[in-house]
C-alpha cells in the first residue's frame, strides 16, 4: 500500500509538470502542430532511459524506481494524447502532418533514449 501511495504522489507531480511544460510549449510554438506533447514525450524518453540506466542495479532503489518510472514519468508522458493528436490531424485531412508527427515522435524518442543511456553511462564513469 505504501508503494502505491508513493507511485500516486509521484504521478501527481508528473501530471502537473506535464501540464505546465506542454502548456508553455504550446503557448510559445505555432498552434498547428502538437509540439507540447512531442516535447513531454521526448523529454520523458530521455529521463526514463537515464534514470533506469543509473538505477538498474540498485536493489534498495526498487521503490524509488517504481515511483519515478511508473508514477512520475508514467504521468508525465502521454501515449493516449499522442495517438489522439495523430487521429485529429488525419481527421483534419492533414495526413502528411499525422505521418510526420508519428515518425518524428518515434525518431526523436529513440534518439532521446539513446542519449539518456549514453549520458547515464558517462555520469557513472565519474
Question: What label would you give each PLM region?
Answer:
Residues 1-126:
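Membrane-interface helix-loop junctions in multi-pass transporters/channels
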Amino acid at each position: 500500500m505504501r508503494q502505491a501511495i508513493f507511485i500516486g504522489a509521484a504521478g501527481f507531480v508528473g501530471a502537473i509538470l506535464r501540464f505546465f511544460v506542454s502548456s508553455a510549449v504550446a503557448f510559445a510554438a505555432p498552434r498547428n502542430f502538437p509540439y507540447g506533447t512531442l516535447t513531454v514525450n521526448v523529454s520523458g524518453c530521455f529521463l526514463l532511459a537515464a534514470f533506469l540506466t543509473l538505477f538498474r542495479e540498485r536493489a534498495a532503489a526498487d521503490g524509488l524506481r517504481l515511483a519515478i518510472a511508473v508514477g512520475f514519468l508514467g504521468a508525465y508522458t502521454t501515449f493516449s494524447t499522442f495517438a489522439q493528436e495523430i487521429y485529429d490531424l488525419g481527421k483534419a485531412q492533414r495526413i502528411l502532418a499525422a505521418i510526420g508527427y508519428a515518425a518524428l515522435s518515434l525518431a526523436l524518442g529513440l534518439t532521446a533514449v539513446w542519449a539518456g543511456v549514453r549520458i547515464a553511462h558517462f555520469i557513472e564513469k565519474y
